[in-house]
Amino acid sequence: MNRVHIKTYGCQMNERDSEAVAAMLRARGYRIVADENDCDILLLNTCSVRDAAEQKAIGKAGYLQQRKKKQPDFVLGILGCMAQNRGASLLDQLPDVDLIVGTQKFHQVPGYLDNLRAARDAGVPIGETIVDIGEEAGSQNTIKDHLLPQDSDSDSQPSTLNSQLRGAAAPPPQITAFVSIQQGCNMDCAFCIVPKTRGDERSRPMDDIVRECEQLAARGVREVTLLGQIVTSYGRRDYTHTNGISPFVQLLERVHALDGIERIRFTSPHPRGFKDDLVAAYGRLPKLCGYVHLPLQSGSNRILRAMNRPYTRERYREIVDALRAVRSDMYFSTDVIVGFPGETDEDFEQTRELFEACNYDMAYVFKYSVRTGTPAAERGDQVPEDVKEQRNQLLLELLRQNSERRNALLLDTVEEVLVEGPDKTGQRFTGRTRGNRVCIFEATPDLVGRLVSLRITRASVSTLYGELMLAGVGRERNRK
């Protein structure tokens, strides 16, 4: 009983947590397998940001309980945000789950599985479900292990645990990596359950993060994405500003100085974290990719106040304009919630106008979801579902049109692309531009991990297609 499959729901933070758990388990002698049908232990790392995410995981767990009836030694565990949010109450719906572990206890999973395995091997009944959702000081420092494919068996899952190359003799090398720098959130947005599921804001020591990035570079990683619930708040309680430079920008500077790291990204920030020092960093740190995920949530000042979001539409637009002044080809993505309680047609129109003006390349548009225990859930002015759906579809159509137009502008330009590995078909290769655009192209395995010049020959709404340039960069980008 040592084959483990981890299925991850939700954000990049969850992906990184799953990778760390997988690496810890592998170090204890467990095998991480890509196919859930081949496992003895299945762990669901869950999301709670919307009710639909929880229901999806509950549905999957309910289905897996049937497997336990046929396979008594099969172990089912629920990890992460839903485990933290619901705790032992999950057993009302899922009585056969063996393990429920919250967001500050991921590092305890190997020990709990060791105990379960020892009991099974000894023929001892398991007894009560293990439930551990307590807070633990220093837990932010435990998400540091990486499951690099070159260190794993050919049937193991790579770092994202969702992108296994089917049919390969061995997994491709890992070129990109997530690095957790901060956990928790103190923002208390009226719609959000994250402070409950992730706890208070906690940052890792800067030296530890830099050392982790240095080790990744030595193992072939060329791009790192720094992760945190509010990543721009990194270190504000632990470090001081130096010459007007925030701790987060100081961290960017140190990672930027590392040999081998060619690109730096980060997510998810908060608009209030974009002070002059961070904006200026885009002009003086060339490894910092010209792509910003900048959550908007609403373009109405009235709704922003109701959401407890401490900025205005005017300030948000100032940030976008300031970043584009530093880099004219800056790419933007965002988060928007439609149908927040009390949102009127006028409020939504203000959101639509700002959404259009900011010229986003990508957006995650969500219908407001009631989350029990949040201030917004108690409001009596909930927006009807059909109105939410109408507003949602309108913004998605605007996004589709804008993405199609902006991608079309890239036709016959030459983009710098980091070759990440074979695409899903295994017939071609994939990589991303500095602006986070996915590209598909023909290449050779020796180019994996290298920055190449790609002439864009075809564009869809979400993907670029191109051909390698043997020399030169071609004409300048023409972005509008």
Curated annotation (Swiss-Prot):
Is the ATP-binding keyword given for this protein?
no
In this chain the TRAM domain maps to 408-470
* The protein's enzyme class: transferase
Provide the Gene Ontology terms for cellular component.
cytosol
Q: Which Pfam families match?
A: Radical_SAM (PF04055), TRAM (PF01938), UPF0004 (PF00919)
Q: What is its main location?
A: cytoplasm
The MTTase N-terminal domain covers 2-118
Question: What is the protein's given name?
Answer: tRNA-2-methylthio-N(6)-dimethylallyladenosine synthase
Q: Which cofactor does it need?
A: [4Fe-4S] cluster
- Name the family the entry cites: Belongs to the methylthiotransferase family. MiaB subfamily.
> Which compartments does it reside in?
Cytoplasm
Residues reported in the UniProt entry to bind [4Fe-4S] cluster 1:
C11, C47, C81
Quote the SMART domains the UniProt record gives. Answer: Elp3
InterPro entries tied to this protein: Elp3/MiaA/NifB-like_rSAM, Methylthiotransferase, Methylthiotransferase_CS, Methylthiotransferase_N, Methylthiotransferase_N_sf, MiaB_methiolase, rSAM, rSAM_horseshoe
**Quaternary form?**
Monomer.
Per its record, the protein catalyses: N(6)-dimethylallyladenosine(37) in tRNA + (sulfur carrier)-SH + AH2 + 2 S-adenosyl-L-methionine = 2-methylsulfanyl-N(6)-dimethylallyladenosine(37) in tRNA + (sulfur carrier)-H + 5'-deoxyadenosine + L-methionine + A + S-adenosyl-L-homocysteine + 2 H(+)
Q: What role does this protein play?
A: Catalyzes the methylthiolation of N6-(dimethylallyl)adenosine (i(6)A), leading to the formation of 2-methylthio-N6-(dimethylallyl)adenosine (ms(2)i(6)A) at position 37 in tRNAs that read codons beginning with uridine.
Q: What is its EC number?
A: 2.8.4.3
Q: Where is this region: Disordered?
A: 145-169
> What Gene3D superfamilies does UniProt report for this protein, alphabetically?
Methylthiotransferase, N-terminal domain, tm_1862 like domain
Feature: compositional bias, Low complexity = 149-159
- MF GO annotations: 4 iron, 4 sulfur cluster binding; metal ion binding; N6-isopentenyladenosine methylthiotransferase activity
- Domain Radical SAM core as annotated: residue spans: 171-405
Fetch the SUPFAM superfamilies from UniProt.
Radical SAM enzymes (SSF102114)
